[in-house]
Amino acid sequence: MATSGVEKSSKKKTEKKLAAREEAKLLAGFMGVMNNMRKQRTLCDVILMVQERKIPAHRVVLAAASHFFNLMFTTNMLESKSFEVELKDAEPDIIEQLVEFAYTARISVNSNNVQSLLDAANQYQIEPVKKMCVDFLKEQVDASNCLGISVLAECLDCPELKSTADDFIHQHFTEVYKTDEFLQLDVKRVTHLLSQDTLTVRAEDQVYDAAVRWLKYDEPNRQPFMVDILAKVRFPLISKNFLSKTVQAEPLIQDNPECLKMVISGMRYHLLSPEDREELAGGTRPRRKKHDYRIALFGGSQPQSCRYFNPKDYSWTDIRCPFEKRRDAACVFWDNVVYILGGSQLFPIKRMDCYNVVKDSWYSKLGPPTPRDSLAACAAEGKIYTSGGSEVGNSALYLFECYDTRTESWHTKPSMLTQRCSHGMVEANGLIYVCGGSLGNNVSGRVLSSCEVYDPATETWTELCSMIEPRKNHGLVFVKDKIFAVGGQNGLGGLDNVEYYDIKLNEWKMVSPMPWRGVTVKCAAVGSVIYVLAGFQGVGRLGHILEYNTETDKWVANSKVRAFPVTSCLICVVDTCGANEETLET
């Protein structure tokens, strides 16, 4: 039988691998013999003098491994003709290891020798060892050593290592500034660090805290630098409450007129209109926001069942939840607060319950002007939008309302093009998208496939391409320029199919279906992954959570993590950053 082309190609690859292994084995054997000759001082033509130790070697081997020795032995330098070559300011053990590496291509890098090895490899220009040390240190970077590693990398001209250390410093600044390494930095490095836009913080008060900690660590000697250091704090970004109660009361600030001016400037910023604030720059440029995203689920018909789901470790934690039960309500998250609105018991609930995730506190505000259930809600630019829904037992509504979180006031906006309830609504790139739903909560209420978008700038609605599948009680999430409609039900029953709306193309496309069919789906997205955390099938609820990777179009049923037990729950993504930290603000 003739051998196929694929088999021939595979055979050639195998033969090449075997030949390469044999060559490597022979080379290792030759070098092993040379290393033994070195140890026995056979044919050695140079002795490296390191303090009191004499290390024999062959010039050609050292020159091949090190650009430093190559230049030394091949130019007219004095050492090129000397049998003994003195290496000043070198450690004997480290030089011994580098010479051994030149013969064996093997070296042990560990936490005890890495700094000395890196210094020597850099000085004697042995790039493979330098790379091994850099790779080792990159894996060791943490809050306690990142500043020192950054300084070391700068001194030894290791840009890749410095970049890794600096990225860690910026991303974990709230941990780094509480370490001894930070307190011992010189003024130049602290000033540079506090000026970075890429510092990842919950709020600017943490940058202020870092500056004050550094100044107070050696107050008598650091007093002259106080204005330069505090000038890097962006006081307009600090809350008015923290400025007045904490910053102004700080003795360092009170005793320095220049610093007091900075604080007063920050206070004045809070008195400006949004338009006037936009004209300012520099001191009002935001830092990189620190995030800790979790998915919050509130019990709905079982209010005591409220939990966070952490997508990092797949853990569930309880949320203290005192409010009464609500059927068919909605919830959204904005600026540390979850807003729970709409829904009904026997009658529509007028009150809006609010939960501050950082302070773990509940309070109530006036709810939507038109109390109703089966509505949808989302947040954008400090405003909470509610759409559609139905007053108990009635048809779906065209209604569209807006709550301004700054003025704490409700406003009625232009109605939707289509009446709908039990629909989905998301914010994407500043626009409000509404998809699906039904014309009423009764059996005869037609399920919709229609979609529309609202532009807050022009206060106008525009009809969009309809979904492929009519659906209500579905999940609707926004991920990277795509809006995903997940499950739900049509006029015949539960759905397992999933489709997404391409915002740029104005078209819907089907993707892989869920490994479960549900008439009600409760899902949310963190990063590129959609998590289905609760749902109802008609005769039973979702048992374990489902995950959908939007980049690979793959579903995973996680059999190790139980789903949320309440199918009528409310769901939203929240940022809990700061919830478990020491609170600076009083």
Curated annotation (Swiss-Prot):
GO CC terms in record: Cul3-RING ubiquitin ligase complex; cytoplasm; cytosol; nucleolus; nucleoplasm; perinuclear region of cytoplasm; plasma membrane
GO molecular function: identical protein binding; protein homodimerization activity; ubiquitin-like ligase-substrate adaptor activity
Compartments, as annotated in UniProt: Nucleus; Cytoplasm
Main location group: nucleus
Function as written in the Swiss-Prot or TrEMBL entry: Substrate-specific adapter of a BCR (BTB-CUL3-RBX1) E3 ubiquitin ligase complex. The BCR(KLHL7) complex acts by mediating ubiquitination and subsequent degradation of substrate proteins. Probably mediates 'Lys-48'-linked ubiquitination.
Subunit field text: Homodimer. Component of the BCR(KLHL7) E3 ubiquitin ligase complex, at least composed of CUL3 and KLHL7 and RBX1.
Name listed for the protein in its UniProt record: Kelch-like protein 7
Taxonomic source organism: Rattus norvegicus
Upper lineage: Eukaryota, Metazoa, Chordata, Craniata, Vertebrata
